[in-house]
């Protein structure tokens, strides 16, 4: 998905209200490209991840239709501290990934929740647990501790500010 950054200089001069972090899912393809999709959970089969996503989407549609869909959003975090060793920052498919600071612009739907609910649902592998975790996830329940996940729809609302340098 490509974002058009027509007035880049003007944009950089504007006051930035809130910075979020976004990470590519592999080698960077273009200066303004944002990718979106499902999260990775180590040691889970593709079938487990796919079925969990289906259940989470079913629960969202049934009980939380105002929330952004995990299937059509960009995933962000407010800060990178605590994400080291977690799915946002480190799994084999992201060894070549880069992290970027982004700003949200325009009309968008933002939802903050605890990413651990999704991870636990995948790891347990049964539909009853997945439904229970999905409800907690979409309620935004629990403490975020280190796993605050931010979903933003549409993905085009996340505009790259600059590459994050450690």
Residue positions per predicted region:
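Charged/polar, solvent-exposed surface patches and flexible loops
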Residues: 10, 54-61, 85-88, 136
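Short aromatic-glycine-(Arg/Gly/Cys) micro-motifs in beta-strand/loop hairpins
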Residues: 43-68
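Conserved NAD+-utilizing ADP-ribose enzyme module
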Residues: 17-18, 25-49, 70-72, 81-166
């Amino acid at each position: 998905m490509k974002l058009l950054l027509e007035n880049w200089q003007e944009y950089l001069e504007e006051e930035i209200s809130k910075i979020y972090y976004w990470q590519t899912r592999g080698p960077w393809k273009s200066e303004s490209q944002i990718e979106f999709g499902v999260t990775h959970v180590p040691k889970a089969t593709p079938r487990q991840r796919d079925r969990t996503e289906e259940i989470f989407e079913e629960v969202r549609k049934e009980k939380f239709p105002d929330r952004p869909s995990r299937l059509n959003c960009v995933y962000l975090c407010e800060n990178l501290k605590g994400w080291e060793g977690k799915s946002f920052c480190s799994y084999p498919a992201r060894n070549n990934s880069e992290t970027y600071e982004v700003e949200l612009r325009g009309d968008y739907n933002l939802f903050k929740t605890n990413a651990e609910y999704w991870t636990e649902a995948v790891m347990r592998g049964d539909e009853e647990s997945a439904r229970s975790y999905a409800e907690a996830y979409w309620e935004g329940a629990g403490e975020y501790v280190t796993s605050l996940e931010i979903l933003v729809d549409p993905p085009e609302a996340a505009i790259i500010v600059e590459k994050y340098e450690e």
